[in-house]
Amino acid sequence: MSLTMEWNDARLRKEAALIPPRAALGASMIYHGLGKLREGAPEQVGGYFESVGLKPGKSLAVATGIAEVFAGVGAIIGLWTRPAALAVLATQAFALGKVTAKNGYDITKGGFEYNIALMCIAGALLIAGPGLFSAHEGIERLAEGRGPRKFLRKAQPSPLLRLIKLIK
């Protein structure tokens, strides 16, 4: 597909429609991940994790923070979007099950409304993938030899290309 297609093209609009959910999910996950990694937070979050039965709390807090930051960056730039979506689904399902489910749906009462919204966005990205306007698409184009010819010679299908397509 040429990037010079007209905006009237329905497929182009559908591809562009993946950008806002990727950006929203990514920004949210980066924010929450960095919150778990800032000074003193691993101990605080780790203490909470241990209070709900997750041990070792501090290590899990750091691992969760790192996973959320990487998932957020991946979602925003459209690289490893499906693994990022899986990470979001896992962390949010866990948060829902261990923390928010007992409070009901209403977010103002500590409920799971926000978890469900993030999980729905992640589920959609898991199904759709990163879309045309993504780092993954750019890398794939380069690996297939569809990118700037002066930088790459035409690539033959390779194990690397198959891996790139697999982790889309």
What name fits each language-model region?
Residues 72:
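Conformational-control "hinges and anchors"
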Residues 40-56:
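Membrane-interface interhelical connector segments
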Residues 1-35, 58, 62-66, 77-168:
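Extended, low-polarity transmembrane helix blocks
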